[in-house]
Amino acid sequence: MHTRAIYPGTFDPVTNGHADLIERAAKLFKHVVIGIAANPSKKPRFTLEERVALLQLVTSHLDNVEVVGFSGLLVDFAKEQKASVLVRGLRAVSDFEYEFQLANMNRRLSSDLESVFLTPAEENSFISSTLVKEVAHHGGDVSQFVHPEVAKALMTNV
């Protein structure tokens, strides 16, 4: 049985969609590691440390969830964390092709690493970090898409 899973991402910022998937994963696995990718090529708005802190805040009520920043290959991070499952979110059919390729690449790099795909609740299916940042950038109210502390951080980091 798989007891340790990783939910990787940039989480710039963490959204209600991410939080929804984390809650679902926490019910399915004994321990969930949220792996926050440093990913400097994406030019994140928040530093790795800020993203870790925001995710720790959002997941503080989940005893079996741990938040860890990482750089390098995801499969190497999974080995370090002794995880055998990657949790990935699928918002729409358009996400599937990329996620399918990614799952096959990860399996090729580490044959004992499985990918599990979860879908968010319908009310979160359209939310993306990119859209949330865009709304915040133009002064829009993002409170319905992110945790209140994340909304506050976005407003001070525009």
Swiss-Prot record:
Sections of the chain in a coiled coil: none
Q: Name one GO biological process term.
A: coenzyme A biosynthetic process
Residue positions binding substrate: T10, K42, L74, R88
Q: Where is this site: Transition state stabilizer?
A: H18
Q: List ligand-binding residues for ATP.
A: T10, F11, H18, G89, L90, R91, E99, N124, S125, F126, I127, S128, S129, T130
Q: How does it assemble?
A: Homohexamer.
Q: Which PANTHER family match?
A: PHOSPHOPANTETHEINE ADENYLYLTRANSFERASE
Name this polypeptide is given: Phosphopantetheine adenylyltransferase
In its UniProt entry, the species of origin is given as Shewanella sediminis (strain HAW-EB3)
**Underlying gene:** coaD
